[in-house]
């Protein structure tokens, strides 16, 4: 009896649960919270890159013939793409650009980090790359 009740409650919660999109979450935040979120992404990216470089240096310090592989360079490029150089410390500009991105219905399912990457590339005037990432994200996260 209890198993049936648990199953019915579980099934009911699955059917009646609302799906929150990344755009809904972003719109529910106040501007201070949006700025804090973006600062957190920037800080975690910088810390991740720093610690990764330290670990690579520790592991390959003694090997004189070691050359940094391309995938490590690409990893650092992806982390750098999350941060807009032109916007500098004006994180509110990035938050407003994310607001504009999420105002389009086609972009509501794009995860926040991908949206931040697209917006940062656009702010750095790499519009071709930003448009390509936007089209790929719209295709990957279609809204029905």
Protein language model features and the residues they cover:
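Compact alpha-helical subdomains of small soluble proteins
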Residues: 20, 52-144
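Generic hydrophobic secondary-structure signal
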Residues: 5-7, 37-42, 94, 98
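Sec-dependent N-terminal signal peptides
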Residues: 2-17
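N-terminal secretory signal peptides
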Residues: 18-68
């Amino acid at each position: 009896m209890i198993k049936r009740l648990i199953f019915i409650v579980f099934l009911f919660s699955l059917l009646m649960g609302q799906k929150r999109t990344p755009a809904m979450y972003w719109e529910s935040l106040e501007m201070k919270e949006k700025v804090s979120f973006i600062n957190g992404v920037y800080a975690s990216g910088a810390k991740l890159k720093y610690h990764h470089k330290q670990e690579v240096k520790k592991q390959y310090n003694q090997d004189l013939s070691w050359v940094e592989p391309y995938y490590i360079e690409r990893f650092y490029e992806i982390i750098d793409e999350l941060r807009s150089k032109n916007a500098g410390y004006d994180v509110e500009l990035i938050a407003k650009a994310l607001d504009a991105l999420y105002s389009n219905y086609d972009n509501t399912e794009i995860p926040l980090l991908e949206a931040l990457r697209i917006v940062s590339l656009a702010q750095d005037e790499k519009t071709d790359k930003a448009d390509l990432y936007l089209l790929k994200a719209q295709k990957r996260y279609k809204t029905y």
